Amino acid sequence: MAAPITTALDADGVLVATIDMAERTMNVFSVELMDALDALMDRVDADPAVHSCVITSGKSSFLAGADLEMVRGYGDAARTRTHPQMFEMCGRLGRQFVRLEASAKPYVAAVNGLALGGGLELALACRMRLVADDPRLQLGVPEVRWGLLPGAGGTQRLPRMAGFEPAMKMLLSGQPVDPGTAMKLGIVSALVPAPKLIDEAKAVARALHGSAYDPALKFKHLAQTDVPAPGNGVSAAVAAKHGVSGTDYEFYPAYAAIVDSVLHGARLSLAEATTVEMNNFLRLMFNPVAGRMVRTLFLERLRAEKELAPPAGVAVESLRVGPISESRAAWQAALGRLKLPQQTDDALPPDTVEVTDRAGAVHSAALRVTTDAPAAVAGAQLVLSPQGPYGRVIEIAGANDAQAATMAALAMHLRSLPWRTPGPVSRLATLQGRTLEEQAQQAAAWASGSDPAFIDVAACLAGVTPAWSGGPLSWQADR
């Protein structure tokens, strides 16, 4: 298998290191890539012909963060390993970035595409960060969405570059920014037309030859004077200022861990601050919430998206839609964004859709939403969930195989996860409004005839079960 990092040294001593992990659509930090990064830094340190290093990607994206299978392994390890053992294992990437940042031979990031999580943290550790000037490119730290925090220096370098409030907005929302916004925030050194990115990065690296690392030059907000001192209630107040409700702060421990990392690391060196950050990361690893969220909202969700997709060759040609009632207006909005031929037909029963497939067959279904009272419906029904932070679900209940396949194709057009259930009563509507204990009891009764993980995925994506639970069955398993 090809090495994950390949290098090319030019005559001026600029080493271009290209990350391109074989058999992956995106680069992600794995043990293999961390090993390769150590080898790269060893070479840069030892080779007198190397004076600087440009890090870029051989893929259309730069680096998409940590391998979440590896992160799930961290969660499993936390059940049996001690804190020092976990610190050594989980803190490796953060220590690598401290070493890279302080190197006498400067590193320059040439960010050619999406950089999330550990990918952005790698760029932040570099002396300079050049980014392709493409408004579609995303830079961010989405870890809070999986119940985690950026554990390789993200909670420390972002506030030192962008300032406290802008950094907290990124860290607590998990929302990415485009290159122009990143430039205004000070987390990007320059925007460069994509075709010129490597040449410009090499020129910047060349200009840095022989210069020592100076944190005061790198970080505009090094003194962290805008960061409040930690104290009773301060972390909760910071989170609340950035839109975190009291309930979410209580049930999602990542919010407190992120704010605590920033407050307690603010006036320390980067090496000391990343230790603070890692201790807070381990708070989350020893808490089952992060493990449940990673498992359900990422790993099992990806599996569901593959296994619940319509069969190859099944396609939607057109739709006829009956009058839609006010209580199901979400369907009106969703169908209004659909780029397929459709017509409204008042002759159809209210809240009904007829979908014509590629073969000309017509499939009918009742249109429902998750807030409808659970009730038996004759024939197929499509139950639409609200659009949530992790996506949207269309439950396909009571459909035959041909109907289910076509309705799954429609769900894909609507950017929704198609979840087929036997019906005639919607399972999402049945779970809506119940306590977690009641949901777990009901879901257990369904599990023998369904993939239990998909029940959890659908319940969380639909918003009928809180994301911190990982779904009713995952929550029950951890009790």
Question: What is the predicted function of each stretch?
Answer:
Residues 155-165:
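Hydrophobic, secondary-structure "cap" segments at the distal end of domains
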Residues 177, 330-337, 374-380, 386-423, ...:
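Internal alpha-helical scaffold of NAD(P)-dependent oxidoreductase catalytic cores
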